[in-house]
Amino acid sequence: MSASAQTQMRNLQGNHACALAAVAAGCRFYAGYPITPSSEIAERMAGELPQVGGVFIQMEDEIASIGAVLGASIGGVKAMTATSGPGFSLKQENLGYAMGAEIPCVVIDVMRGGPSTGMPTRPSQGDVMQARWGSHGDTVVIALVPDSVAEIYSQTIRAFNLSEQLRVPVVVLIDEIIGHLVETVAVPAPESLTLIDRKWADSPVDTFKPYAINGDDVPPMPRPGAGYRTHTTGLTHGEDGFPTQDPVLVAPMMDRILGKLERHRDLVDC
């Protein structure tokens, strides 16, 4: 098949490109709360997800939105939310939870002027440091920063791939300008995309350790309904997932969780 046959030229708004890319990447759950200038992402997801068997939920607030996304991801589906400014601030605790419990998800932050309520309809790039340092405890978060509508599409797909491959939350930083900008984008055919899905556990149920330290920085996830029993917590935990403060157990676990991004930096660096 020729390259031209694999792509479709479309005039897309940046926020719409983000939504379409998420669906193309396999996202089947979206929970969000309307907030300018990201609301078009939620609107588009509300229309797209039912067509592919996905679920869209408008939650009561920003904290509930990220909580629902983490629950859906644990439940076995690729999940995303989008927000801006003060909403991104409210999501930080659960972003840290996702890092500690190794729950893959994608968070889109369409940046606007701040601080506080700031300027909802004006652009800003003021959330870069928050994306990096927003959560406590030396949390490391991947942040991708597209600079065009075409890159919004490609980097949203990349965000899902990195999230699933490394079992981490991934943030995509857009701003109001490119979020609302309309450009002609070469949208690749779905069959031409390289998509990465999480590793699923296939070990015997009675010996399964959900956070195993076995030389692989990314342990497989238990598939819901497959008989695996697992405990998910934001507390420091051992390989079995249960809370512990034993330094003999905590030290290697934290090295694996916090160090895996540095050890796999080649996947992230452009």
Give names to the regions the model predicted.
Residues 1-133, 139-140, 157, 176:
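Thiamine diphosphate
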Residues 2-14, 164-270:
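Flexible, low-complexity linker and terminal segments
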Residues 17, 40, 151-154, 248, ...:
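Generic recognition of stable, solvent-exposed alpha-helical segments in well-folded globular domains
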Residues 56, 105-108, 131, 143-144, ...:
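Generic structural hydrophobic/aromatic packing signal, biased to beta-strands
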Residues 68, 154, 182-183:
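Short, solvent-exposed polar/charged micro-motifs at secondary-structure junctions
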Residues 122-176, 200-201:
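Conserved thiamine diphosphate
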